[in-house]
Structures are given as C-alpha cells and as structure tokens.
Amino acid sequence: SSAASDVYKRQFLGGLFGGMNVIKGQAFYGTTGLLHAPTAVMQKDKTVMLGGNMLDVNILSRYWVRSEYHPYTYNYYINCTLFPWLEVAYTCTLVKGIHGSSYWPQQTWGRFTNQDRSFHFRLRAWKEGWWKAWTPQVVIGANDPGSHSSNGGGDIDWGGGGSGNHNYLTRYYLAATKHVEFSGIGTVGVHVAWVIGKAMSDVHYSRPAAGVNFHFGMKGEGFWQKALNGFNLMAEVCPGHAEDLHTATYTVNVGGTYSIWKDHINLIAELNDGKFFSGGIFFKLHLK
C-alpha cells in the first residue's frame, strides 16, 4: 500500500541521513576546515577520516602548474583526531616525472610516478563558549611544516626555502570560529584566520582569510528535509596566487560537502576563484 511505502521510505531516509551532527567542512589539505581557508572547528574525539581528491592544479603550488599535470592531479590522506584538542593528518599528493629532467628517468616523464608527502597539525587553544556564550573557538595549525632541505637529506627546513626543499603546501595559521544556530533551519559558522603562507615554489604571504558555512538542519521527516540536511555549503576568501603565479592575491571559493550516509560517507566539491573545479570523497569513522 502507499501508506506502507511511505513508512519504508521514511525508515530508509532516516537510516541514510539520520544521526548527523553539524558536519565539519573537509579542506583539500586533508584536514578539518572550509575548502582552503582554515577554521577552528574540530572533529569529535577519536574520529578517523580517510579520503582522496581530484585537484585542479591551479589551486596548488606552482610546482604542479606545468604541462604534465593539466588539468588535474590527485591526493589521498588519513586524518585522526587523537584528542578533542589535537588533530593530525598525513597527506600524499601525486607527482609526475618532468619532461626533459635529468632527475626523472625518461620512462617516468608525464606519468604519475611519485608522491609529495606532508604532515598537518591542528591544536585547539580555546573551546567555543568556554568563558562567555559568545566567545569563539580558537585553533593554531600548520600544513606541511617541515622538510629536509636537500631532497631528503640535510637539516629540517620550516619555511619553504632551499632548492631541495619539498614544502609545497607549507602554511601556518591562527583561526577563530563562532556558530549561530537557527532552530529548525540550520547552523551558520563564521570563520576568520590569519594565514602565513611559505610554500616552496609559490608566493609567500601573511594575510587574513575569512569564510562562512551553512549546514541545513530542517525539522521534519519528509524526503526533502532529510535530503537538504546532508548539505554543508561553504564560501570563503582565501590568500593564494594570481594567474601569473608570482603575485599574492585572494581567491573567492564556493563549494561544500554532502553526507550521503550518516556522516560516514561524504562528498566534497568546489569552484576555486569561480572557475577551477576540484572534488573528492572522504570516509569518517568515530572510534569512541
């Protein structure tokens, strides 16, 4: 009967979308955040995330903006929130052999043959609402903070300098986040950060970043309410490089995530600077 069919549909959608809390944006660095802009949002204690992305090379360091990569490269990562105040991640970005290079064997030219490895850390310095209800959460973070200065040897370089340095994603930041809930509609997150970019083969900068996200929280058991509640929409203004690749500028990025099963399986997509598409998928497990 149609009544029974409606019951089964509600049960199915409840299992598919139910049980979700406010979804944290998953940055393309493989850490919690917006799309590229840092935030102070933390995952639940003992959360493990596994994911991968298809990345337009224009959003990366100039190292990837070469003919071998157009239009995309890829990354994959594992991320763990060890404590409520500490998140760590290990990310690998695929690398191709460079045409005409004496470093890369000829059979690797133009083929994915290696990967750039990077570590990422986020430390919560202040929890949202600790002092007053209006006080934001504060996080200190680092992406790809250190690498050997000479192609795997030599001293550790923390700043993206040296010809043999592989710090292609290096940046440091201080971020603050505040959430405002609209009952029966959703939750807005407001995020500001100061970002110091020191990536190898890229422009260096010390600039602010800002963004907002909106996670639907519609009341009701209908199909559309449950479907909408999977969306976490994002917009940000983030430091980056201009199209000449040598000038620091800002990019306006829009995108979001969509949870297709109880926050365990999530999709992410963005338009960087309104024209460069990247997308990915990540899986989330709560071990506690």
Predicted regions, residues:
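Outer-membrane beta-barrel "beta-signal"
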Residues: 118-121, 210, 274-288
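A cross-taxonomic marker for long C-terminal extensions/tails that follow the last structured domain
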Residues: 250-251, 270-276
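Outer-membrane beta-barrel transmembrane domain signature
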Residues: 17-20, 25-26, 56, 165, ...
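A short acidic, amphipathic alpha-helical/loop segment
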Residues: 77, 254-255, 279-281
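Active-site proximal loops enriched in glycine and acidic residues that flank catalytic Cys/His/Asp
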Residues: 235-237, 269-273, 283
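Transmembrane beta-barrel domains of Gram-negative outer membranes and organellar outer membranes
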Residues: 12-172, 177-183, 219-223, 231, ...
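Short, small-residue-biased leader/transition segments that mark boundaries at the very start
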Residues: 1-8
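Sequence/structural signature of beta-propeller domains
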Residues: 261-264, 276
